[in-house]
């Protein structure tokens, strides 16, 4: 196949900068083991990515969505909003359950005086020095 030029792809993706981003993202996907949709023909991954875009075997919109998704660090999930009354009922039930749990569990912790703490610290043995540093 002849060399893939920007002119072959520019009618599929209007912006040249976006084309570079999409082709780079697709080339990284290919490097990570994604299936290619055109014959390899001994070409490198960026050329294959451009050929896939030029031949329209991949949708630029799908590539763009995948690129955006790969760059997101926090994905917000749309959850259906509950009615105000349902939320109030759930909150009241949670408060009542918490009060009941507190009364049943009454967790106690051991108390330590400052002198006991200092005596424990003095009794600690320092770790042996090693040549790993």
Swiss-Prot record:
GO biological process annotation, one example: DNA-templated transcription
MF-aspect GO terms: DNA binding; DNA-directed RNA polymerase activity
Domain of life per record: Bacteria
Coiled-coil ranges from the UniProt annotation: none
InterPro entries, alphabetized: DNA-dir_RNA_pol_omega, Pol_omega/Rpo6/RPB6, RPB6/omega-like_sf
This enzyme's EC code(s): 2.7.7.6
Any one annotated GO CC term: DNA-directed RNA polymerase complex
Keyword Transferase: yes
Entry keyword set: DNA-directed RNA polymerase, Nucleotidyltransferase, Transcription, Transferase
Reactions accelerated catalytically: RNA(n) + a ribonucleoside 5'-triphosphate = RNA(n+1) + diphosphate
Function: Promotes RNA polymerase assembly. Latches the N- and C-terminal regions of the beta' subunit thereby facilitating its interaction with the beta and alpha subunits.
PANTHER family registered for this protein in UniProt: DNA-DIRECTED RNA POLYMERASE SUBUNIT OMEGA
HAMAP family listed in its UniProt record: RNApol_bact_RpoZ
Assembly behavior: The RNAP catalytic core consists of 2 alpha, 1 beta, 1 beta' and 1 omega subunit. When a sigma factor is associated with the core the holoenzyme is formed, which can initiate transcription.
Protein family membership: Belongs to the RNA polymerase subunit omega family.
Entry protein name: DNA-directed RNA polymerase subunit omega
Organism: Mesorhizobium japonicum (strain LMG 29417 / CECT 9101 / MAFF 303099) (Mesorhizobium loti (strain MAFF 303099))
Lineage per the UniProt record: Bacteria, Pseudomonadati, Pseudomonadota, Alphaproteobacteria, Hyphomicrobiales
Gene name linked to the record: rpoZ
